[in-house]
Design a protein with these regions (language model features):
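Aromatic-lined substrate-binding rim segments of carbohydrate-active enzymes
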Residues: 45, 49-100, 206-225
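Conserved, mostly hydrophobic/aromatic
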Residues: 128, 135, 144-147, 222, ...
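Glycoside hydrolase catalytic-domain groove-lining segments
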Residues: 183-185, 191-315
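Bacterial Sec-dependent signal peptides at the C-terminal "C-region" and cleavage site
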Residues: 12-26
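Substrate-binding cleft of secreted/luminal carbohydrate-active enzymes
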Residues: 261-278, 291-367
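Active-site-adjacent "subsite" loops/lids of carbohydrate-active enzymes
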Residues: 80-139, 156, 187-200
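Catalytic domains of carbohydrate-active enzymes, especially glycoside hydrolases
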Residues: 33-67, 138-143, 258-264, 329-335
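Short, acidic/polar
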Residues: 35-50, 124-135, 245-258, 315-326
Length: 367
């Protein structure tokens, strides 16, 4: 079993309807079967969610509107809303002081299409809190799924981009205060060199705690306004040793820490984007379940998101079928696919999803 160096030390069945209760997890709750992105694309193409075997949609917050929400509810599906937590592109246009700063004291360049933000920027956090409250004021959601909960980096590519951030004076000041360390150096680059040379382990832990604080604070807002709604987190599905422990070192992600604060973990199992075989989807899901359920008593749900999207390269219908099956294996209690456009543009993939969602059954405990 793989283990995290930072505190990290089960069957899918597509079978006869006669021997099991359809669409139930081992705990007897409904197995989630969804589509991520802008699922209204399916409606515009003439499909109904319920006719495709779906019981959930995972809609980007920018695509959420009353017409879509009402239609989804009328068709009997749950509505989970993606929330772009630390995606900074929009905010940085008018607030350059929130730009993530690298160890040289420079603005860290965009990582491919993504630009993160300084997670300690109080104005940005207040901005995101207002946005979340606005969603919850207007929609009774089944859950909020936090996205981009990581320090500035890019992992949705075969070759990741892994800068060192953020060393702005705000971050180094808060780090020094929070850990009772005296940070030596006059310039940002001098402070960064001192931190990485003398307090690297403490620095990595502090960065992870900053992200966990975001999850806690967003979760508090959600539970205060809609106590029954689930708090989910999308996150990079690397094993702890991948890319020289970059999941923790660079991105600041600790899956066990997330599991302590969220109701649902959704590993982003985009096999083509990450250059992995289809079997990796099932291997990671199994590893994650063993890891988080050993470390914490509360059972956090696992709902993987898998790739149908043709980028990079082509994901064949059979390949899509394989990752759907792998991602639905225990301990998964739900699955979603990316993206809606892939289904509409390739009817074969639509049929793959429909067939799996219509037949999927998870054995009850003891069966």
């Amino acid at each position: 079993m793989r283990a995290f160096p930072f505190l990290l030390i089960i069957l899918f069945s597509v079978s006869n309807l006669s021997c099991q209760t359809p669409n139930q997890t081992k705990e007897g709750t409904e197995f989630i079967k969804g589509v991520y992105g802008n699922p209204a694309t399916l409606l515009k193409a003439g499909y109904r969610f319920d006719s495709l075997g779906m019981n959930a949609v995972f809609v980007r917050s920018i695509s959420l509107n009353p017409d879509f929400y009402n239609t989804a509810k009328e068709q009997g599906v749950k509505v989970f809303v993606e929330f772009p937590t630390l995606n900074g592109k929009e905010y940085l246009k008018d607030h350059p002081d929130a730009w993530p700063i690298n160890e040289k004291g420079e603005q860290s360049p965009p990582a491919d299409w993504f630009i993160g933000i300084c997670p300690t920027h109080e104005g940005f956090k207040a901005y995101r809190e207002r946005q979340l409250r606005e969603i919850l004021d207007n929609y009774a959601v089944d859950g909020i799924f936090l996205d981009y909960v990581h320090w500035h980096a890019q992992f949705e590519t075969t070759e990741p981009i892994l800068p060192e951030t953020c060393f702005c004076n705000r971050c180094t000041g808060k780090f020094g205060e929070g850990t009772q360390q005296k940070i030596q150096g006059e310039s940002i680059s001098e402070k960064a060199t001192f931190i990485l040379s003398h307090h690297d382990k403490t620095w990595r832990k502090w960065r992870s705690e900053i992200l966990n604080g975001w999850i806690e604070d967003m979760g508090s807002i959600l539970k205060k306004q809609q106590p029954e709604a689930k708090l989910g987190v999308f996150y990079c599905s690397w094993f702890p040793e991948d890319y020289d422990s970059a999941l923790y070192r660079n991105l600041g992600i600790d899956p066990v820490g997330i599991a302590e604060r969220a109701d649902v973990l959704s590993p982003m199992l985009f096999h083509h984007m990450k250059g992995r075989p289809t079997a990796w989807v099932g291997e990671y899901t199994d590893w994650l379940g063993k890891t988080i359920h050993i470390e914490k008593p509360k059972k956090t749900l696992i709902w993987p998101i898998v790739q149908a999207h043709n980028n990079p390269g082509i994901v064949s219908p059979d390949e899509f079928r394989q990752v759907m099956i792998e991602g639905s294996k225990s301990p998964s209690s739900g699955i979603m696919m990316f993206s809606d456009h892939s289904l509409v543009s390739e009817p074969e993939k639509m049929e793959v999803m429909k067939k799996i969602y219509s037949e999927i059954e998870i054995e009850k405990e003891g069966h």
